[in-house]
Design a protein with these regions (language model features):
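Short basic (Lys/Arg) and small-residue
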Residues: 151
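Acidic, low-complexity terminal tails and accessory targeting/binding regions
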Residues: 2-6, 86-96, 139-145, 160-200
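Internal catalytic-core helix/loop-beta-alpha segment
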Residues: 104-108, 112-141
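Phosphate-coordination/substrate-recognition cap region in phosphate-metabolizing enzymes
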Residues: 2-3, 42-105
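Loop-to-helix element that buttresses phosphate recognition and phosphoryl-transfer chemistry
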Residues: 8-66, 116-131
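Short active-site segment of divalent metal-dependent hydrolases/proteases
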Residues: 16, 154-155
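Short hydrophobic/aromatic-enriched beta-strand-loop microsegments
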Residues: 31, 73-80, 166-174
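Active-site signature of alpha/beta-hydrolase-fold catalytic machinery across serine-
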Residues: 69, 157, 161
Length: 200
């Protein structure tokens, strides 16, 4: 049972040039596009008036900038919120990867090691990071809301783990850029209260 008065608010960063063109973006620190900055700023009403106990963001600039544009203050940088390391598939599109591995699917087949700084991660490794984040922030929900500003694949894995599903079950939760989701409880059990909501 989870004792929570607040909700876990998830913000996915705004659009980047790589996300716009379908390139797998793990640890490469790409900036928001102008459209991404506008979408990030438009997230502000979704969190205005919330009783925010804590706000944390991935240290990658696309997430940190989204947090700032959404009006969050006193944001803690949390390396645990970084995106899934795409390893040797960093910067490639799914069609490009499938030229090498026909039928490839991230959630089933994973990634290959890349160059220095891009060793790649398995779904289980990303799930372990998500578990660590949840272990640290869930107690704070007893006093109010917690905002996490992060990345598409990581937030999908985190949501699966919140629901006590395996990390790869994150494949079921499609998530666009510049969107807000909320995770909460019902009768002490974890639920999704809203998902993939675009800015107003």
């Amino acid at each position: 049972m989870i004792v929570a008065m607040g909700e876990l608010i998830l913000l996915r960063h705004g659009e980047t040039e790589w996300s716009r063109t379908g390139r797998h973006t793990g640890l490469t620190d790409v900036p928001l596009t102008p459209a991404g900055e506008a979408a990030a700023a438009a997230l502000a009403p979704a969190i205005a008036g919330r009783d925010i106990r804590c706000a944390c963001a991935s240290p990658l600039q696309r997430a940190a900038r989204t947090a700032a544009l959404a009006g969050l203050t006193d944001v803690k940088q949390d390396p645990g919120l970084r995106e899934w390391d795409d390893g040797g598939y960093e910067g490639l599109t799914t069609p490009q990867i499938r030229e090498q591995r026909p039928g490839w699917y991230l959630w089933r087949d994973g990634v290959i090691p890349g160059g220095p700084g891009y060793p790649g991660e398995t779904a289980e490794q990303v799930g372990a990071r998500a578990d660590d984040v949840l272990t640290r922030v869930t107690p704070l929900l007893a006093d109010g809301d917690v905002v996490l500003v992060s990345h598409g694949h990581f937030l999908r894995v985190l949501t699966a783990r919140w629901l006590r599903l395996g990390p790869s079950e994150g494949r079921m939760f499609r998530l666009g850029t510049g969107t807000v989701c909320t995770l909460g409880t019902e009768h002490g059990e974890p639920v999704i209260t809203s998902w993939n909501v675009p800015p107003c």
